[in-house]
Curated annotation (Swiss-Prot):
<dbReference type="InterPro" id="IPR011035">
    <property type="entry name" value="Ribosomal_bL25/Gln-tRNA_synth"/>
</dbReference>
<feature type="compositionally biased region" description="Acidic residues">
    <location>
        <begin position="185"/>
        <end position="202"/>
    </location>
</feature>
<dbReference type="GO" id="GO:0003735">
    <property type="term" value="F:structural constituent of ribosome"/>
</dbReference>
<feature type="region of interest" description="Disordered">
    <location>
        <begin position="180"/>
        <end position="202"/>
    </location>
</feature>
<dbReference type="InterPro" id="IPR020056">
    <property type="entry name" value="Rbsml_bL25/Gln-tRNA_synth_N"/>
</dbReference>
<keyword id="KW-0687">Ribonucleoprotein</keyword>
<dbReference type="InterPro" id="IPR020930">
    <property type="entry name" value="Ribosomal_uL5_bac-type"/>
</dbReference>
<dbReference type="GO" id="GO:0008097">
    <property type="term" value="F:5S rRNA binding"/>
</dbReference>
<dbReference type="Pfam" id="PF14693">
    <property type="entry name" value="Ribosomal_TL5_C"/>
</dbReference>
<keyword id="KW-0699">rRNA-binding</keyword>
<dbReference type="GO" id="GO:0006412">
    <property type="term" value="P:translation"/>
</dbReference>
<dbReference type="Pfam" id="PF01386">
    <property type="entry name" value="Ribosomal_L25p"/>
</dbReference>
<comment type="similarity">
    <text>Belongs to the bacterial ribosomal protein bL25 family. CTC subfamily.</text>
</comment>
<dbReference type="InterPro" id="IPR029751">
    <property type="entry name" value="Ribosomal_L25_dom"/>
</dbReference>
<dbReference type="InterPro" id="IPR001021">
    <property type="entry name" value="Ribosomal_bL25_long"/>
</dbReference>
<keyword id="KW-0689">Ribosomal protein</keyword>
<dbReference type="InterPro" id="IPR037121">
    <property type="entry name" value="Ribosomal_bL25_C"/>
</dbReference>
Amino acid sequence: MATLKANERTDFKRSTLRKIRHSGHVPGIIYGKEITNTPVSLDSVELLKTLRDEGKNTIITIDVNGNQQSVMVTDLQTDPLKNELTHADFQVVNMSEELEAEVPIQLTGEAKGVKDGGVIQQPLHELSIKAKPKDIPQTINVDISGLEMNDVLTIADLTADGNYTFTNDPEEVVASILPPKQEAFEEDAEPSPGEEPEGENQ
């Protein structure tokens, strides 16, 4: 579990927030059940590195002036023009209580339908699960090797490979295999030998 040091914020002026960001830090808020919200600032590079190395659902220990709390990042705000992290939300978690999380899907295997020329469609890229913090995976592998042409894989077809449960609608589609699109020239049949194409009669 990564540990990040943070400083408590007491000045909320816009000019102060700009100074925080210009110094390479990001303002944030720590919140949770039965605790007082705590505005903080922390090193943005260290935060992004932790999330990149360990995944967005990793549990982080935040040390605010010696007071340590286990948290998860629930929201990151960025400035698209500057490509800069502007704010982060941290939820305090109870390691013995279940919580909900969104986990990225990783499709594995090559579907039989794709080998036959089909096209895979993936309308769902994250799964909603409920689990204790330590049991939340960083990705969930979904094997599609058995899917044939026109097959549809739904949440109901999945089996959890860890200590978590899916909270999505069971009928929600994860992936499907569609037949290949016919080329335009195949749809417009060529004239038979000896048959004059329409519009060329003199």
